[in-house]
């Protein structure tokens, strides 16, 4: 695959993850009565986070204007660990949603958002 294909893939994957977060936020805030659907959104985020490190192979830094910092590649193990943390947090949210525990869903969504923020602070422009 071309480096450009990897860049496009990760842009789309991260956009999808963000869109799932927006949907989850609306559900958790009670704007939509779709608690049963929340687990699906959380599971999608977990899947994206699990696959994300593979979308940043060597040779794809600086290919196009992106928000990824060079530290993604120089601290690849830390980047992978952050992706795992996000995946685990998304799985915890899915479990809370499956159990119908709205209070725990709110806590789990906040925890997931915290993992996203932590990764963004280190690895995103």
Swiss-Prot record:
Protein name, UniProt field: Cytochrome c'
Pfam families, A to Z: Cytochrom_C_2
PTM text: Binds 1 heme c group covalently per subunit.
Record flagged with keyword Iron-sulfur: no
Top-rank lineage group of the source organism: Bacteria
Listed GO CC annotations: periplasmic space
Organism for this UniProt entry: Pararhodospirillum photometricum (Rhodospirillum photometricum)
Role: Cytochrome c' is the most widely occurring bacterial c-type cytochrome. Cytochromes c' are high-spin proteins and the heme has no sixth ligand. Their exact function is not known.
InterPro entries hit by this protein: Cyt_c/b562, Cyt_c_II, Cyt_c_prime, Cyt_c_prime_subgr
Gene Ontology MF terms: electron transfer activity; heme binding; iron ion binding
GO BP: electron transport chain
Subunit organization: Homodimer.
Binding of heme c, residues: 10, 67, 116, 119-120
Keywords: Electron transport, Heme, Iron, Metal-binding, Transport
Keyword Ligase in record: no
């Amino acid at each position: 695959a071309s480096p450009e294909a990897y860049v496009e893939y990760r842009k789309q994957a991260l956009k999808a993850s963000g869109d799932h977060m927006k949907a989850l936020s609306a559900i958790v805030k009670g704007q939509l009565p779709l608690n049963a659907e929340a687990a699906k959104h959380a599971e999608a985020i977990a899947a994206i986070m699990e696959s994300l490190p593979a979308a940043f192979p060597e040779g794809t830094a600086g290919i196009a204007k992106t928000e990824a910092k060079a530290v993604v590649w120089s601290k690849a193990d830390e980047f992978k660990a952050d992706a795992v943390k996000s995946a685990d947090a998304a799985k915890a949210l899915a479990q809370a949603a499956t159990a119908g525990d709205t209070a725990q869903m709110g806590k789990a969504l906040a925890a997931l958002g915290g993992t996203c923020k932590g990764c963004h602070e280190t690895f995103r422009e």
